[in-house]
Design a protein with these regions (language model features):
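All-alpha RGS (Regulator of G-protein Signaling) helical domain and cognate RGS-like helical scaffolds
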Residues: 1-343
């Protein structure tokens, strides 16, 4: 009835009713602010990496600077909005607004790259599922890149966050339903992601047990340490499955060793560690709270182990995508952008 009356008034008087615009844009979500802050920091860092790669004098041709440019370009492309547009910077309300580009010195660059990586992991804890996974991937890659560059440039190692924290204790008896339906193995849920990680840790423990007997003497201590890590990770993953009231998968009596294990056990271990990255990424996206915290820690630690065994760390560990599918960086216009050139 009210709609009809309004329509008659409009037709009879020729008036056009326009809703009042408050002039206040809707507030951005935490996840969107985190994305914008990550993009801003990444573009600033990319400018510094370009400057280092092109620097004359003692910093000329710094090894790894070109790789850092490539890494940060990929990160910036992944962090663009769906339309592939650069926003105006600084992003109001972003959790980590940066006033200016970091100084293009090796030491300052490593420090800022590490700081950015740590902030991305911090923001991943509270972001929505898909954005949490992207931020965890970007943060892990930036932290590990900072660590690698510090070693190559003979700088002090950046302070990195502690990984593989012990998860919450299992719930008390009676706090979980007495009977719950088994989740669909193909469904993307916290239960299925945890189950996948439990199975992967069972396999990793088995493979490392064999590896410590097959590796050369110089590699045995590292393999023995990683075996202990995977035994702890297995217990933690099982505990977290209990916390989430899921069914804990049992291990197999034995596992098929990777095809290259006989000829190159170290390369097989590198592949094994790298194969766990998407599993940790899944859990980051599909969980919350302490379970997500553990998954973020696990992603970073798995990336470090895979690199230590010789694997090439992907630009976005924990995400399975082709960088060629990402949007290209647009050429910025105006003076508000944190980066003056895209190459």
């Amino acid at each position: 009835m009210l709609v009809s009356v309004v329509a008659l008034l409009v037709v009879g008087t020729g008036m056009v009713l326009i809703p009042r615009d408050s002039g206040t844009p809707p507030p951005r979500s935490f996840s969107e602010n985190a994305r914008l802050a990550a993009l801003e920091d990444t573009l600033l860092l990319r400018d510094s990496a370009v400057a280092l790669a092109d620097a004359p004098g003692p910093d000329a041709g710094k090894p790894g600077a070109d790789d850092a440019v490539t890494l940060l370009t990929t990160h910036a492309r992944a962090l663009l909005d769906p339309a592939g547009q650069l926003p105006t910077f600084p992003a109001a309300g972003s959790p980590t607004a940066t006033a200016s580009s970091p100084k293009a010195t090796p030491s300052a660059f490593v420090t800022e790259l590490s700081r950015s990586g740590q902030q991305r992991l911090t923001d991943a804890h509270e972001s929505d599922g898909g954005m949490a996974r992207l931020l965890a991937a970007v943060g892990s890659a930036q932290l590990l890149s900072a660590e690698k560059l510090a070693a190559a440039w003979k700088l002090p190692a950046p302070t990195l966050p502690t990984t593989s924290r012990v998860p919450a204790t299992a719930p008390a008896a009676g706090s979980c339903p007495s009977a719950s339906p088994s989740p669909d193995a193909d469904a993307a849920t916290t239960d299925t992601a945890l189950a996948s990680l439990v199975r992967a840790q069972h396999e990793a423990v088995y493979v490392y047990q064999v590896a410590v007997k097959k590796l050369g003497a110089s590699s045995v201590p590292a393999a023995a340490r990683d075996l202990e890590v995977h035994e702890v990770l297995l217990r933690q993953a099982e505990d977290l499955t209990g916390v989430n009231c899921g069914d804990v998968p049992t291990g197999e009596a034995g596992y098929r060793l990777p095809a290259k294990f006989a000829k190159d056990p170290a390369a097989a271990l590198a592949d094994l560690e790298a194969s766990s990255l998407p599993r940790f990424g899944d859990l980051v996206a599909l969980s919350t709270g302490g379970t997500r915290d553990w998954a973020i820690d696990g992603l970073l630690a798995a990336g470090r182990r895979s690199s230590a065994w010789g694997a090439a760390l992907p630009a976005l560990p924990g995400l399975e995508l082709d960088a060629g599918d990402l949007p290209a960086l647009p050429t910025p216009s105006g003076t508000a952008s944190p980066t003056a050139s895209i190459r």
